Design a protein with these regions (language model features):
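A short beta-loop-alpha structural element at the N-terminal edge
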Residues: 5-18
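Conserved acetyl-CoA-binding loop-helix of GNAT-fold acetyltransferases
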Residues: 111-130, 140
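Conserved acyl-donor/pantetheine-binding loop and adjacent beta-alpha core of acyl/acetyltransferases
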Residues: 62-114, 124, 144-173, 181, ...
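Active-site rim helix/loop that mediates acceptor-substrate recognition in acyltransferases
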Residues: 28-89
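Glycine-rich phosphate/pyrophosphate-binding loop shared by adenosine-nucleotide-utilizing enzymes
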Residues: 4-6, 57-61, 98
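Short acidic/polar active-site loop segments enriched in Thr and Asp
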Residues: 136, 186
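Anionic, Ser/Thr-rich low-complexity intrinsically disordered regions
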Residues: 20, 26-34, 40-51, 63, ...
Length: 211
C-alpha cells in the first residue's frame, strides 16, 4: 500500500508561482483567479491562505476571508461575498464567520483513482482556523459542476431539483455538493449568477458548517 504524506501549511509570496500552476490545473479558464487576486488575499488575510504539499510540490490551495454572516440573509453570490475575489473590500476582521474564497486541487494531488484527501485536508484546516479564531461557522459558495452535463444528458431540470437529487447511498448526485456534505456542511441557499462557471451554469449553493 502506498502511503502519501500530505502537509498543509500557510502560504507565502514565494508560493505564488506554484499556486498559479495549481489554479491552472484545477479550474476551467473562466473560473481561474488571477495572480493579483492571490497576491491580494495573501496581503489582506494571510492566516486564511493554505497550501497542500506532496513530495515537495504544492498540489492544492485554499484561501479565505472573515465576513459578518447572517444565516437568514446569506450572501447572494460568490462575486458579492468576495468582491469578485478581491477581498480587500469584503474582509471584515470583526466578522463572525470564515468564508472560503477558493479551494483547488491539482491532478498531481490525486495520484490514486479516488484521490488521497488533499481537498479534505485543506477544508479541515479552514475548519480549524474557524475554531482558532472563535468564529461561529465556516461558509462558502459551492459550485455544482455536474449540473450542465446532467442537463445535457437528461434534459433541462430546475436547479432546485438537481441539488436535491441523491444517489443510492443517500449522498448528493453532484460531486462537489457530495464532497461538502461528507465534510459536515449543510445547504443553505441556491445562488444564481454566483460566478462565471459554464459547468455549473453560473449557479452556486451556499453551504455552512457550524464551528
Amino acid at each position: 500500500m502506498v502511503v502519501y504524506d500530505v502537509k498543509i501549511r500557510n502560504a507565502n509570496s514565494a508560493d505564488l508561482d506554484a499556486i498559479m500552476q495549481v489554479e491552472k490545473e484545477a479550474w476551467p479558464i473562466e473560473a481561474r483567479a488571477s495572480r493579483s487576486k492571490f497576491r491580494e488575499r495573501l496581503m489582506v488575510f494571510p492566516p486564511g491562505v493554505f497550501v497542500a504539499v506532496l513530495n515537495n510540490e504544492v498540489v492544492g490551495v485554499t484561501t479565505s476571508q472573515i465576513i459578518m454572516y447572517d444565516p437568514k440573509n446569506p450572501p447572494n453570490s460568490w462575486t458579492e461575498a468576495t468582491n469578485d475575489g478581491n477581498i480587500s473590500g469584503t474582509h471584515n476582521q470583526g466578522g463572525n464567520a470564515i468564508y472560503v474564497v477558493s479551494l483547488g486541487v491539482s491532478p498531481r494531488g490525486r495520484p490514486g483513482k479516488k484521490g488521497i484527501g488533499v481537498g479534505t485536508a485543506l477544508l479541515e484546516r479552514q475548519k480549524q482556523l474557524a475554531k482558532e479564531l472563535e468564529k461561529e461557522c465556516l461558509v462558502l459558495s459551492a459550485r455544482v459542476p455536474g449540473y450542465n452535463s446532467f442537463c445535457e444528458n437528461k434534459g433541462n431540470v430546475p436547479i432546485q431539483d438537481y441539488v436535491n437529487y441523491r444517489r443510492e447511498d443517500g449522498l448528493p448526485e453532484d460531486m462537489e455538493l457530495r464532497f461538502y456534505e461528507r465534510a459536515g456542511f449543510k445547504q443553505v441557499k441556491i445562488c444564481p449568477n454566483t460566478m462565471d462557471d459554464v459547468e455549473s451554469r453560473n449557479y452556486g449553493v451556499m453551504v455552512e458548517w457550524k464551528a
